[in-house]
Amino acid sequence: MANYIKEIRALVGHKPLILNTAAGILVNDQQEVLLNLRTDTHNWSLPGGYLEYGETYAEACVREYKEDSGLDVKIVAPIGIFDKGETVYPNGDVVQTITELFLVTAIGGQQLQHATDETIKLAYFDFDNLPPLLNQQT
């Protein structure tokens, strides 16, 4: 069901939706966090995204991390659930997200590269010098 969100939007248009998302925090050896610059909003965010029908939060986190960054990751630990995020996308879609956030670690030694057109670029940032994020609650 890779087009689950598109199918829902075809039915409801831009009306507000509550959707489930998963994201991961990956910290490198320099204690910097990986962020991706999103194509849809031109905001920085943690790699992650919407759950597909039938997926767990952990499965979605691993899948979205691969799509957004090119990295295979494994879940180290859940960090928490955040449920106050509201995003208005440039196309008019309004979404309140319920996000499960995980600490992840990279496996396999791949290079950073985004696998979809959802990511403009990837970069590591020092925790004390983060850019404005798409969803400030995470």
Regions found by a protein language model. Give the residues of each.
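Residue-level preference for beta-strand/loop junctions
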Residues: 18, 42, 94-98
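Acidic, metal-coordinating catalytic segment for phosphate/diphosphate chemistry
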Residues: 1-23
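Conserved Nudix-box catalytic region and its N-terminal flanking loop in Nudix hydrolases
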Residues: 28-68
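Active-site beta-strand termini and strand-to-loop segments that position acidic
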Residues: 26-29, 104-106
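Local beta-strand/beta-hairpin segments that build beta-sheet-rich folds
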Residues: 79-80
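Conserved beta-strand residues within beta-sheet cores
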Residues: 21-23, 72-75
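Unchanged
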Residues: 51-74, 84-138
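A residue-level structural signature of the nucleotidyltransferase/glycosyltransferase Rossmann-like core
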Residues: 16-19, 32, 43, 122
